[in-house]
Amino acid sequence: IFDKADEVLGRSISKMCFEGPEEDLKQTINTQPAILVTSIAALEALREKTGVKPDFVAGHSLGEYGAYYAADVVDFATAMKLIDKRAREMNDAATKTKGAMTAVIGMSKDSILDVIGKVDGMVSVANYNSPAQIVITGEAEAVAKANEALKEAGAKRVIPLPVSGGFHSMLMEEASVKFSE
């Protein structure tokens, strides 16, 4: 699977996955294809060992592409090419903007929305992972201010995420438009 990914992408994502360096792997342009190929490799290992074929699949964001593959909606090469294009567009948008993301744990949705609504700058909810964990996103400075305000307002934990951009925010609008073309 990893060799096929290298061939489709025209670069060694396998070497990056197995040998690093970590700094290269953390770049959006590499992270997304690496996660997808690893997810597909895990799926194929499970299929080979158990013969399991899912009745339905689901995925969120990058995970949608693994779900498309698992459901036989797209073949491997198409999935990898799509995610490579997506990663490139998001990487370009992230380098043009200074964004950040934070996981907020132990605070209600309404309280989080109230706090971030009072912060100057662009900050919004990216993901409702569970009732106990919500991810915020936006301009790095606004997210940093929101982090402090959320701590002061009683969030149990405020965890800045090690990402290279303000994904799932308006900072990615350009990437969304280009990817849809």
Please report, for each region that a protein language model flagged, where it lies by residue.
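Glycine-rich nucleophile elbow surrounding the catalytic serine of serine-hydrolase chemistry
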Residues: 60-69, 73
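Residue-level recognition of oxygen-bearing side chains
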Residues: 30, 62, 141
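Alpha/beta catalytic cores of group-transfer enzymes, especially the acyltransferase/condensing modules
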Residues: 7-11, 71-181
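Helix-rich "cap/lid" substructures immediately adjacent to catalytic or cofactor-binding pockets
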Residues: 1-58, 136
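A short small-residue
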Residues: 18-25, 66-67, 157-161
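A short acidic, glycine/proline-enriched capping/turn motif at secondary-structure boundaries
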Residues: 42, 64-65, 89
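Short, glycine/charge-rich beta-strand/loop segments that flank catalytic centers
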Residues: 22-23, 58-62, 87, 99-103
